[in-house]
Amino acid sequence: MGKIIGIDLGTTNSCVAIMEGNTTRVIENSEGARTTPSIIAYQEDGEILVGASAKRQAVTNPKNTIYAAKRLIGRKFEEKEVQKDIDLMPYTIAKADNGDAWVEVRGNKLAPPQISAEVLRKMKKTAEDYLGEPVTEAVITVPAYFNDAQRQATKDAGRIAGLDVKRIINEPTAAALAFGLDKQEKGDRKIAVYDLGGGTFDVSIIEIADVDGEKQFEVLSTNGDTFLGGEDFDQRIIDYIIAEFKKEQGVDLSKDVLALQRLKEAAEKAKIELSSSAATDINLPYITADASGPKHLNIKLTRAKLESLVEELIERTIAPCRTAIKDAGISVSDIHDVILVGGMTRMPKVQEKVKEFFGKEPRKDVNPDEAVAVGAAIQGQVLSGDRKDVLLLDVTPLSLGIETLGGVMTKMITKNTTIPTKFAQTFSTADDNQPAVTIKVFQGEREIASANKLLGEFNLEGIPPAGRGVPQIEVTFDIDANGILHVSAKDKGTGKENKITIKANSGLSEDEIQKMVKDAELNAADDKKKLELVQARNQGEAAVHSVTKSLSEHGDKLEAGEKETIEAAVKDLEAALKGEDKAAIEEKTNALMAASQKLGEKMYADAQAAAAAAGAGAEAGPAAGQAASSAGGASSAPHDDNVVDAEVKEVKKG
């Protein structure tokens, strides 16, 4: 069995790690970097760029360069978070037939799992290049506050990338694994993981206990916001620059897609610089132009100004921290260590706010960019059976239930329940002689079902006629270790049962996933196709060159009709060579070979006559063979009848 790799599929950056014995290793990608930008670009010629190469060309190709696709994964187009992103993103967010948020690129609609699969494929390739063997299994991380639809969509992305996803693990839990495994402190420790990434925020309270030499990681509670992260911080800077530039120059950059892409790069760079310096210059020459000529942008941004721009965003992370502490049933003073995860936690103001809330300095010995991937790799080793000293007890982040009479949400499994878990409850019919019941499954904390996220629905039919409240229908909720829900309903009277794995009432169907898996395989076969096309084109061009040359020298010996046929075949092949159709090129090449056969025969006869006249009959055979070959006609060598050797003519003349 090959290694199970750990992948942190991030909003902004992704990372892959493996275990080598008892040591973890983060693997550098083909560019030598330990993290890869989660950016995918779709080129005009069909090529797909991933990572740094996609990021570099974003300014010139903003509409077809997709970043932060994770913010759309498992989401409906109508959700307010998606609607907010539509105005901000340079690419087009479209509504899929099933109501999901998809992305439109070069006239094609793509599902977010399909886009994320490109990043996962690069992570897979990075690991394979390092290990020198195929990789088929992975543990992939998700924000702890991801709902069922988002987890399922992430798993689908793994499948599309050719990976068997052994486990979906929560990012803060993975970071805790990475932190806790190499710590020698004895006794139980409670840690808070504050994870502020590119697009999502999570906080988890985790207890690390030593149980008979085994480290037990138990998640006590989790909370967060799946639409708050570094991208939002960047947007605050972009909005500020646009406003300042409009004040100074009277030009609104918000409608200029190219300018926006340059602003995004500049904002991200400025944000990073201000983590270590007090001020930075944002300098973008030729940002736009009007009737008076080109306009240049030069704005000074101080750390204090940045902090005032994003203060409210940082403040938004504190409420989930408060809730997580309360749900865990502990007080802030019970926390032993605070771990910071995600690139945004490098910002001094974020660290200051975390210290203020938890009353202690956050740990600095955890790499915020790599800890999550490392934890995923550790979990991979546990799942493969190579590690026996770790037990991970995770929780479901949101309550799960069904809609009952009056539109009420009846909770079956409450939030922060340790998973895997199973729960059954008996319900009955609301009307007399009701032949079927519809089970609608929701996720969320609101008392009214419709205010929560509808995950899916199914029917249990064939209930025998009976009075209201008589039939006994047992509904069972079963959450697996990935946090993915399976629901079944059974009529206790008849034994009839129906069940579903919740795949969101939309999501990708099995057929769509299979199609995307095939598309992904086709992508890998693309290079092979391109090579075959080049070879066919070379062969065709050689045939055109050879026959045209022979025609100019020996064409006068042909009848007008024969000459016209060859010239028409040359024209047809030249037209085919301008296209991308390999089969058409090969077909027209073969047609030209057949059409030029008469020319070959004439040259063969000429060569024989010339040889006889010179009294060199013995050598006529080889000479004729060369002549026929040079015309592209039917050569006597059967295995060569489709190959045109354009060099042969030069030998004959020489």
Curated annotation (Swiss-Prot):
Q: Which residues carry this modification: Phosphothreonine?
A: T200
Indicate, by first and last residue, each region the UniProt record lists as having compositional bias (Low complexity). 610-637
Inducing factors:
By stress conditions e.g. heat shock.
Biased segments, Basic and acidic residues type: 638-654
What are the boundaries of the region Disordered? 610-654
Highest rank taxon of the organism: Bacteria
A Pfam family recorded for this sequence = HSP70
Record has Transmembrane as a keyword = no
Q: Name one GO molecular function term.
A: ATP binding
Keyword list, A-Z: ATP-binding, Chaperone, Nucleotide-binding, Phosphoprotein, Stress response
So what family is this one in? Belongs to the heat shock protein 70 family.
Q: What does this protein do?
A: Acts as a chaperone.
**What is the name of the protein in this document?**
Chaperone protein DnaK
Organism (species)? Paracidovorax citrulli (strain AAC00-1)
What is the name of the gene encoding this protein?
dnaK
